[in-house]
């Protein structure tokens, strides 16, 4: 039996806004620098291969890194030392955006050209497809350039349907729609390009990129509060509950605590042959090494603690 989608009404969100806490990042010059250094030439590509518009990066439980880019082998796997392992499902992708890994090491991708979200097993078999391949739309069976995907403890799936639709859709673990929220705008619960999404416990963090804020909701889409910390391109939450936010406009990565305070900043390395720091998305491994995906420089990088 189909599940009726329950859209949260804007009037409810507006009422919540009067009591919500809004955080601003002030005195940015006092943010401590994160003590990282770039690892030169970490990713060892096969002869003749190169990255193109690197949009996504993720790390699995073995320390293997997935790089999602817009070249002829869009999804590439590397081992913990940076050695190339394989490319996965070359013919499935149109325009790479985000790659994520869930608690069972399944691989999830969002594709802004194909308008789909895919779940693949660790060996690369497609287990679930959300949306309709190459068919955009604004109902619950379609996406319009989905930007990111996240999962809660129950296995429910949350999709930021951001480039074409300003909304979040929630599905159960079988891919059946449960609820959705959001519309174009700048008010609480509204979005102007929800570009990233991450979940920590019972909280859903949405990177509302063009409104230059992170909005925080409960698992049912109820607006709680927001933080204004720049333009959130990518979000990643570590096991110790720090939120890492990449901002490709400012060319930096922020480390944010649970109160919404920026407690560290990585401004990136000096420009390499004119290529500026452009962190579109990011991931952090168990050793707190940082990995970045950069669209304009066609680059993926690893940063290690000094």
Model feature map: region roles:
Residues 11-22:
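Bacterial N-terminal signal peptides
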Residues 5-6, 16, 288:
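Generic extreme N-terminus detector
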Residues 25-306:
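Eukaryotic scaffold repeat domains enriched in small/polar residues
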Residues 1-12:
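Bacterial N-terminal signal peptides that target proteins for export
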